Amino acid sequence: MYKNIILLGDMGSGYTEQHEVAKLIERIIKKKSKNLICGLGDNIYEDGCKTINDIKFKTNFEDPYKNISDKNKFHMCLGNHDYHSNYKAQIQYGILSSKLGKKWVMPHNYYTYSANNIDFFVIDTNIEHMTDLLIRKQYNKIKQYMNKSKNKWKIMYGHHPLRSIGGHGNARKKLEQMIKGLISYGNVDIYMSGHDHSKQLIKMNINNRDVYQIICGTGGKPGDPYINMNNMRDSELLFFSNIIGVCNIRSIDNNLILDFLNTKIKEFSYTFKK
């Protein structure tokens, strides 16, 4: 049982902000508990990594999180900055890390895993770098994972949001169709992302069903001040903050408790029930 499921996006800057958020995670998890970190992409700024031996794995990941025990696993997805050079280096690093019992987990650019009472589906939203064949291959594979899902809660995450009032805005049409299609097929309860450097909770209606979007892109760079409420014309914004920090999900009595945290205080809480 994982005590905390921490959402961390847009973190790999090497900046002071990344180190401050790392200290926040240390305070949340403490030393004895076992916790899970969902890495929401842009793992290594500005241009990802060239090879598995790239020094940025050390400076922008290992060093900032060195005080977090290796029993706390970072289940990563790929962001747009991770595609600037060789995205496969991050997968290779993840496979080696898992073999050595280290933190970084990334067996593929899309995959599934389970924790507590949740089935997670990790997707690669960088579809502008994919052929239509590769997009369909990912889509069909995630559907296969969903067919085997047994847990009460279904959470999917990738780097790009479906809805957002931040600077990057809503997903483009082709990506929106992919994300919505998977949400509908798998009865996904929550979709999580980074990309915009803010924390947001958005209530969406997809096929007459409430689905929640969590954005947490405040893990390593100053917050994005841009706000465009026009992007909420078919959704409801429940919370927004552009202060650096994380989100934390706890499983309590089959409910999910979501906390939005900056480096000083808890900003907002929400309980998911079903």
List where the protein language model places each region.
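Residue-level detection of beta-strand scaffold positions
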Residues: 6, 121, 260-262
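Short, mixed charged/polar active-site loops
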Residues: 2-4, 210, 266-269
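Extended active-site neighborhood of metal-dependent phosphoesterases/phosphodiesterases
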Residues: 26, 45-154, 167-190, 196-252, ...
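Composition- and surface-driven signal marking solvent-exposed, interaction-prone regions
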Residues: 20, 135-137, 261-263
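Residue-level marker for buried hydrophobic side chains located in beta-strands
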Residues: 5-7, 37-39, 76-77, 156, ...
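C-terminal/domain-terminus segments
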Residues: 261-274
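N-terminal active-site segment of His-dependent metallophosphoesterases
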Residues: 1-56, 164-165
